[in-house]
């Protein structure tokens, strides 16, 4: 197991991509601390991880409350040490610049950027002697302008730049900071949407070079690589997990 003896925090760990990441890291020997706002969902994830032989604890946490969020990270670090931080929790806001209120716009940044910044700040101090890894989950919409998602797209673009900046500031500390940018992924929310509108699902898949949506486990596999020593010389990277969609966009826009 490549993460034996490591402790990792996964935000937004109660569902979808975060759930898959938690299960994957635990399956490779990490003690995972999963946090989210829904206690029942967290415990369901924890039960599955324990049933598979993994080590897990849960923390009910709203990452937008940065004071309590950073206190939680510090508490985990003081109790178990901290080797891995996966900033996965996200707010997905809809609305164009003309329509979305400034408050709606800011909510995307509070969760997607402010919480990540605050979490990294504490994690970097905790990891300074641990050769740690921070993985920020961005989005394909951070690589391109996405009409109708002004706040979300802008915040995910900011997250990518923050990742690059943090990687430069921490490289001398032997802490690696990388990003993963998922494309369309078959999360429970996406699955519910497709069930309500099958034609929309077909259209999404048809627009992906690999002709299908990704699975949460496929994102988790990349996070495992970045969290482990397999990527010991990788920092500041942005790895798309999107079935080739980003390359298609680059060709079309070029």
Features from the language model and the residues they span:
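Conserved glycine-rich cofactor-binding loop
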Residues: 7, 14-15
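Short, small/polar-rich loop/turn modules that mediate ligand/substrate recognition or access, typified
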Residues: 86, 171, 176, 234-236
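Substrate-binding pocket helix/loop in short-chain dehydrogenase/reductase
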Residues: 96-97, 104-109, 204
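Active-site helix of classical SDR
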Residues: 120, 155, 163
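Alpha-helical segment proximal to the catalytic Tyr-Lys
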Residues: 125, 168-172, 232
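Residue(s) in the substrate-gating loop at a strand-loop-helix junction
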Residues: 139
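Short C-terminal tail/terminal secondary-structure segment
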Residues: 144, 224, 235-254
């Amino acid at each position: 197991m490549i993460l034996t003896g490591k402790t990792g925090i996964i935000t937004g760990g109660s569902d979808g991509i975060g759930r898959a990441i938690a299960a994957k890291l635990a399956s490779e020997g990490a003690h995972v601390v999963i946090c989210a706002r829904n206690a029942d969902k967290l415990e369901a994830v924890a039960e599955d991880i324990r049933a598979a032989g993994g080590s897990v604890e849960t923390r009910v946490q709203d990452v937008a409350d940065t004071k309590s969020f950073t206190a939680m990270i510090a508490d985990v670090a003081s109790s178990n040490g901290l080797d891995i931080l996966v900033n996965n929790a996200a707010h997905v806001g809809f609305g164009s610049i003309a329509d979305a209120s400034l408050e709606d716009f800011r909510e995307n940044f509070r969760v997607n950027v402010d919480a990540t910044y605050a979490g990294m700040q504490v994690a970097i101090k905790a990891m300074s002697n641990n050769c740690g890894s921070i993985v920020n989950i961005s989005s394909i919409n951070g690589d391109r302008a996405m009409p109708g998602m002004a706040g979300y797209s802008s915040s995910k673009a900011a997250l990518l730049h923050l990742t690059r900046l943090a990687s430069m500031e921490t490289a001398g500390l032997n802490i690696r900071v990388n990003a993963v940018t998922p494309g369309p992924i078959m999360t429970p929310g996406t699955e519910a949407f497709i069930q309500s509108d099958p034609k929309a699902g077909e259209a999404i898949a048809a627009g992906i070079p690999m002709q299908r949506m990704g699975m949460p486990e496929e994102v988790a596999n990349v996070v495992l690589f970045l969290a482990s020593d397999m990527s010991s010389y990788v920092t500041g990277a942005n790895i798309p997990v999107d079935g080739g969609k980003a390359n298609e966009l680059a060709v079309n826009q070029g």
